């Protein structure tokens, strides 16, 4: 019994530095009652806890387990609380970022609809997004080619075109409506209204042969009558141009010799005689 007492006394007095064994027994006896009462840190911190704390503080391990000067990541490790706050902030701001990434630039027409939408109206938003279909290059080319041929399509033609390019008739109808409006707005901006094409211009050709005879000397009256019959008004020609044409006709008749027998019409008349 004396050996056990000395062992317990050595461990208690020298290591825990307790003043009396009676106090130890009282503290041990009171321990279960305190545990039954509830967690009270003020009552638990008796002379036993203080002695253990003093013993730990007297140990030579007062420095940290690693030297902060040798660790290159101390600037991030020193601000762990700031990182936690930033992570909470990112987690809180993540849902609106996801929602904005789905619709980065809502149009002006869709903004009031989005304001009116409620959390339960997610199906309507999905339907609206499905209606906005991006046409492929082949589909757009075929639609534009058909639009150049025919600006308005009937119901059977619309269905046939939709089946060819794998679209619905409603999508084809809406595309044609939008394209017509776009073309009309472009013409209005450029100031180009739809006008009928002008009739082809008629050019007056001088009469060289009349009634089987060459007309070398033309008078102004004959030329005016010829141009009037051709469809060009006489006012289109000035008097100076008429004189110039008459002079050229006279010069050509004077320079070229007259050979009546060489004319094919004259030969035909001679044979008929």
UniProtKB/Swiss-Prot annotation:
| DNA-binding interval(s) | 128-187
GO CC annotation terms, alphabetical: chromatin; nucleoplasm; nucleus
Q: Where in the cell is it found?
A: Nucleus
Q: Return the annotated region ranges for Disordered.
A: 1-56, 90-131
Q: Compositional bias of type Acidic residues: which residue ranges? A: 20-38
Keyword field: Activator, Developmental protein, DNA-binding, Homeobox, Nucleus, Transcription, Transcription regulation
Question: One GO MF term, please?
Answer: cis-regulatory region sequence-specific DNA binding
Pfam families from the entry?
Homeodomain
In the record, biological process GO terms are: astrocyte differentiation; brain development; cell differentiation; digestive tract development; negative regulation of neuron differentiation; neuroendocrine cell differentiation; neuron fate specification; oligodendrocyte development
What does this protein do, in the record's words? Transcriptional activator involved in the development of insulin-producting beta cells in the endocrine pancreas. May also be involved in specifying diencephalic neuromeric boundaries, and in controlling the expression of genes that play a role in axonal guidance. Binds to elements within the NEUROD1 promoter.
Q: How does it assemble?
A: Interacts with OLIG2.
Domains: what does the record tell us?
The homeodomain is essential for interaction with OLIG2.
User: What family is this?
Assistant: Belongs to the NK-2 homeobox family.
What PANTHER family has UniProt attached to this entry? HOMEOBOX PROTEIN NKX, HOMEOBOX PROTEIN NKX-2.2
Under what name is this protein listed?
Answer: Homeobox protein Nkx-2.2
